[in-house]
Amino acid sequence: MLSQHTQARIEQLAATLGLYIYDIDFFKEDNRPILRVSITRKAPMQKQDCKNGLAVSLQDCQNVSELISPLLDVEDENLKDYNLEVSSPGLERVLKKPQHYIYSLGEKVSIKLMDKSVIEGILHDVNENVSISIDTGKEILSFSFADMKKIKVVFEL
């Protein structure tokens, strides 16, 4: 796990390139520690109208990797023998944090509920502490965060 200080420094460095940190995950895959940093050109709290033409490029990922790698090697003693991956959050990204929900307002989402049912609709509204609302095309439904097991953006052509 990264310290709050290190995460803040990563966010500052990405901002110098006009990029934002969407998420930072630390996990093991095939017994290898991986630090995955997801970046975007859009600030996490910006609304739907800021999406056009803001795709992350391979060059953006490389630039962020080159900026933060020395920082991680020096500042965070908890990281030893890890692999750094920098990428976009993807088209069908999982929404985990309140800012992810706000970032995805107006997009089609799939919600897997605790009872294992799945509902799709347009993410309509977010109350950061309590619930979200989606427009299914027939009605607007609200769900508490406690009722949701997983929510992700659904890519459509």
Curated annotation (Swiss-Prot):
Give the UniProt subcellular location, in the record's own words: Cytoplasm
Instruction: Kindly indicate where the leader peptide sits in this chain.
Output: none
Q: What domain of life does the native source organism fall in?
A: Bacteria
Specify whether Cytoplasm is a keyword of the entry. yes
Q: Name one GO cellular component term.
A: cytosol
The cross-references to InterPro entries, in alphabetical order and at most eight, read: Ribosome_maturation_RimP, RimP_C, RimP_C_sf, RimP_N, RimP_N_sf
**BP term (GO), one:** translation
Q: Which UniProt keywords apply?
A: Cytoplasm, Ribosome biogenesis
User: PANTHER family attached here?
Assistant: RIBOSOME MATURATION FACTOR RIMP (PTHR33867:SF1)
Any idea what job this protein has?
Required for maturation of 30S ribosomal subunits.
What is stated as this protein's family in its record? Answer: Belongs to the RimP family.
Q: What is this protein called?
A: Ribosome maturation factor RimP
Organism, per UniProt?
A: Helicobacter hepaticus (strain ATCC 51449 / 3B1)
Q: What is the lineage of its organism?
A: Bacteria, Pseudomonadati, Campylobacterota, Epsilonproteobacteria, Campylobacterales
